[in-house]
Amino acid sequence: MSSILTSTVTGIDAIKILINNTADKIINSKYKDEIKHNVFVENTVDESNFNAGVKIKKIYDDYNDFLKEEKRKISERVQDEQTKIEEYLKLEDLFGEKSNIFTLLINQLYSSIENDIVNNHGNVFNENIENNLNTIIHELKNFDEKLSFLERDVKESIKEKIKQANILINKIYDTNIDIRFFPTAQLPNRIDSFIDKRDKLIDELNDIIGVKVIKENSTFKVCLNNGMCIIDDYNKKNLMTLTSDTDDKYISVGYFDDNEQRLKKIEHMIPSASLGALLTFRREDLQNAKNKIGQLTINFADSINSVHTLGYDILGNIGKQVFKISNPEIISSSQNQSYLPTSIKWVDTADAQDTNYIVFLKNNHWTVTRLRDHSVVEPDIYQQDNNTYITFDGIEFKIEGNDAEGNMYMIKPYSKTLNELELLIIKNDLFSISSSDDLNQKNRNNAIKIQHLHQEKIVNKKETLYESYLRFLKSISYKCNDLEEKVPFKRNMIEILNNKKLSESDDMYENYQNLNYEQKCYLANVKVLKMAETIFDEIVDCYS
């Protein structure tokens, strides 16, 4: 029986192995007929002479704590994925609603150019063409407004989540104090209600920011998943909403470091649960959506500008630009060692990418990184008159003077694109119809070239405007559908783990009076293993 004594916590590891490996084994049909129960034996028994009942209770406590931890991990993922689904659906609806811009409206524009200029030999931007151009601009600006509204909505949701998290942090801290100073000796059966209350509050906090509980000796800690402690027996850290005076859409999360006496941003420490999902959606998915619309707008407007300014009107004058297009935005890091004059402009929008950039000087070498996928771009760099010119993805970034080591700049190509997009022509302005300025050899070749732009692969030189738009819309739908398939199984996992708590009788003497110590440990361990098998079987049934 002594060997049983040294393996009383076997069931804890058995549970862990079963839960961690079950899904993979079931998904892979190769293993369907050979699912095995793995049991790892670990010597965790303390041979000191404290009460045997306490030792046995620890078997149940370790099992129950493990179960709570697993439920919280799954619940955290469910909240993360459910929050993303809700935001993806909003974004998908918006892109679906506005798809007519890159189908119906743009086709109407090019059809009016074909009919009024090419076929009917018109020579000016008539009312029909002007209206079509203005309608496209109006719809693009409305698209931008709705994206901004969605961004503000996400910002308010983030604020609310931080507020809820702080309420829970305060309640958990206060409840933990009640537990620490509870008169257990006088009221031995009353403390469990306080512990249950604390557990429920931690469950709620976990769904918002993702946490783990650490119990060491007599101490109790609640930490973020990266290990930063936010609640212990003596202190708590409340979260703070970080906003910007210069950008009303910016929001992040941080806390006040008492040791360093300053605010610290911790957005990267909360990568999941509902708050992490909102922060990620705002930082990545919303930004990618805005950049994609900005890229398509630039490609559309500048493709017309480029062709129109190559041709000639009926009087032999070179064509003028049709649209006003804004240049990218430069944001200098607040940590830069020097502040030199900078400027930026588009030099070839055909190379425009749907991403923001970080431009960084390290070891006297300029590095350009696309933030969409963190790929590094090798820029073209040249010096002239003590100025540095850095060209990448159709953008030319100019720095006047010698920049300092470590200086960093963020480049946002489309932050002002939709807001500042303007039509530069008015009704009856001359259309650049001809490829020749010879009045005796006038033709309609330039107008025909503009008319065919809607068929050209002008996005990354491999997609039409609509193809690129549709691919982005499908990527949103795919991510949403993928999560919608995963969430139900995870919810079922939570249900499976519910009500699987194990405990011995409250009357320790009555429960064990006829058993020796080894037998008590053995029976406790058998109960844990039996429950492990029950959980295992329910997971199999769930996936069958």
UniProtKB/Swiss-Prot annotation:
Q: Which UniProt keywords apply?
A: Bacterial flagellum, Secreted
**Subcellular localization, per the record?**
Secreted; Bacterial flagellum
What InterPro entries has UniProt attached to this entry?
A: FlgK (IPR002371), FlgK_D2-like (IPR049119), FlgK_helical (IPR053927)
Gene Ontology terms: cellular component: bacterial-type flagellum hook; extracellular region
Query: Which Pfam family, giving just one, matches this sequence?
Result: flgK_1st_1
A Gene Ontology molecular-function term?
structural molecule activity
One GO BP annotation is: bacterial-type flagellum assembly
Q: Where is this chain primarily localised?
A: secreted
Q: Which family does it belong to?
A: Belongs to the flagella basal body rod proteins family.
Recorded protein name is Flagellar hook-associated protein 1
Q: Source species, please?
A: Buchnera aphidicola subsp. Schizaphis graminum (strain Sg)
